[in-house]
Amino acid sequence: MSARTVKLAVIPGDGIGPEVVAEGLKVLSAVAPRHGLTLDTTEYELGAQRWHATGEVLPDAVEEELRQHDAILLGAVGDPTVPSGVLERGLLLRLRFNFSHYVNLRPVRLYPGVTTPLAGVAPEDIDMLVVREGTEGPYAGMGGVLRKGTPHEIATQDSVNTRLGVERVVRYAFAKAAERPCHKLTLVHKDNVLTYAGELWQRVVREVGAEYPQVEVDYLHVDAATMFFVTQPRRFDVVVTDNLFGDIITDLGAAVAGGIGLAASGNINPEGDFPSMFEPVHGSAPDIAGQGKADPTATILSVSLMLEHLGYADAAAQIDQAVAEDLQERAKNGGVRSTTQIGDDIAQRVAEQG
């Protein structure tokens, strides 16, 4: 691509977030000049520290500033000193909803040299892309409580599924399936119980699928899908599912592909009306924060996803190759490296590529 300046908002966040983000930026800085890419980064202090100091999670003015960027790189959000849900809903979900991040993209890939808990599984057996709907379902926040504190208390949490919301994420998933060699898409839901939502998803997949005759389509109940993630991971190529089911099966996917320390994600607005946000899926791990023990690989792979989204597929491929080489080296030689050492090694591999 031609020379370009990318405005990148950086949210290190809580716990190990600042440490892993620093290594992601290190690798990004190593690959960017090779592709005519100039970085204009702005760091935002959003997370537990800000909440304790001001009582705010994401001020409106800061949200407006974030809106002006091309992409957002997030480290981790969460702290035991903050009530559960305050940071998650106030920052993560707010950005997903307000920036229309209706695609949550989660690659599930077993790299050579990485250990999986599954017996008899090779790297070529686990290479899938989970496309999770990101702005609807039970996460929409609709519901309520009646007769709270009484023996007759009732709590409801509604799952919202709109035609618009389902169709746009299904279209994205079909487009991805059409690009990949296997040309296969699996819808995961629970339509035998969630009959109204399930029927909508099934109908939309059938209708959109008619536009992609080259893509093979199948369906699995979510409980069956979890079983096949473990027993037959090779049957999956692109998986499309709703917000809740996607949240669950992607963590299972991370586990079978070597652990959550290698799991990258993108919260994507495909049209580019808002900046997409990229983050490792692991938590803030406050128990090891500041000790140099955190593996930054998931953040580095999230940077790769970001570059691919921005149109720099070659740069993304260079990072993927460097990570794959580093993981093979780990398997061969073992040893313990610090967070910064892993970042240094991967950045050096990127710089040395021809």
From Swiss-Prot:
Annotated positions binding NAD(+): 283-295
UniProt subcellular location: Cytoplasm
E.C. numbers: 1.1.1.85
Enzyme class: oxidoreductase
Keywords: Amino-acid biosynthesis, Branched-chain amino acid biosynthesis, Cytoplasm, Leucine biosynthesis, Magnesium, Manganese, Metal-binding, NAD, Oxidoreductase
Catalyzed reaction equations: (2R,3S)-3-isopropylmalate + NAD(+) = 4-methyl-2-oxopentanoate + CO2 + NADH
UniProt GO MF annotations: 3-isopropylmalate dehydrogenase activity; magnesium ion binding; NAD binding
Chief localization: cytoplasm
Gene Ontology CC annotations of this record: cytoplasm
Sites annotated Important for catalysis: 139, 190
UniProt-listed GO biological process terms: L-leucine biosynthetic process
Function: Catalyzes the oxidation of 3-carboxy-2-hydroxy-4-methylpentanoate (3-isopropylmalate) to 3-carboxy-4-methyl-2-oxopentanoate. The product decarboxylates to 4-methyl-2 oxopentanoate.
Annotated PANTHER family: D-MALATE DEHYDROGENASE [DECARBOXYLATING]
Quaternary structure note: Homodimer.
Family: Belongs to the isocitrate and isopropylmalate dehydrogenases family. LeuB type 2 subfamily.
Protein name: 3-isopropylmalate dehydrogenase
Source species of the chain: Thermobifida fusca (strain YX)
Source taxonomy: Bacteria, Bacillati, Actinomycetota, Actinomycetes, Streptosporangiales
